Amino acid sequence: MLLWCVIALQNRVTVEVSAALSREPFLYGKTPPSLNFSSELRLQPFGNSCFLPQKKNRIFRGHIVTFFFFIAYLFPLYYNRDIVREGGPAMKIKELLDSPKVTISCELFPPKKGTELQNAMDIVHAIAIDGVDYMSVTYGAGGTAVGKSLAIASEVERSGVPALAHLTCIGAKKDGIARVLRDMKAGGIDNVLALRGDRPQGMDELPESDFPHASDLVRFIKETGDFCVGCATYPEGHPESRTLDEDLENMKRKVDAGCDFLVTQMFFDNEMFYNFMYRLLAKGVRVPVVAGVMPITNAKQVERIFTLSGTPIPSKLRAVVERFGDHPEALRQAGMAYTTGQIMDLIANGFNHIHVYTMNKPEVIGGIRRTLSEVIKL
């Protein structure tokens, strides 16, 4: 690019000077010398056998243009010499979670259509303005949206907010995962949520993979680069686990492999979560746990969530849905109030780190932060 600019500038200056000489003949019938970019720099007014002094000013202006082209070329290289966010050095999420400060984070997912990517970027900036401590970005089923996911996560970092990039390993090979990790580092991403990933529909057996379990992925990430690694946890137990104790053992294996913190799947019953935390601590798991909540905004959403999880709807939430389910705006307000109450109860009981599943709706996180503005400051 820089070479092209210099060549173009050279040709322009040569043509301008040659044209000037043809308009202003040299005295004594002298033939103008052959001019090129380098020789023009040495020509000075000398008697009657040189072009007029103002032609040198044209060349000088050409040098100024070249200089600014050169600066424009070097600036991005200098600016990106280290992977940093606009808000400062890249931050490890574990540093946030190790503090007593209340943190509010949220989850984003990439659009299904590439044409909607700009809308996702606009959502990133809208949420960044409202203020969150970090944003997680999902990976798509089987990593199908990896390019869009990394683009969004990099945009999150550029907005001044730490990004937590999801990474699934189901059916993955080590070289493929290593390539994605390199792309993450190049995009300024230092935080990864390591997941096995969902079993493909219609498959009884898991596809062949270098990472049979999420703990294998955690270990590989820690060996590969300087990443802060989180993992998912299920307060009601993973759907594929036979018992909650079996699931808790899996959590411990992830932590032993190097997991820095855990983020729960969404739950709607705080008492169930507190019981889960007691049992997790009894297993010796001491990493920070981020509580995941999601405001209910429509009745069908409730049915789908609890059908997939295989758990019963808490009686308090069922009452809300039954009373307001036929009135969308009323249900939206009631759902936000239910989640806000959950968050207040969690913080009051010492669980200061909250992750909100927003379904890509900036107004959700904005509403929660405004309602709990004084609570969050504590």
How would you describe each model-predicted region?
Residues S105-N119, L164-D175, G230-E246, F324-A337:
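Active-site mouth loops of central-metabolism enzymes
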Residues E107, M135, M184, K254, ...:
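Conserved, mostly hydrophobic/aromatic
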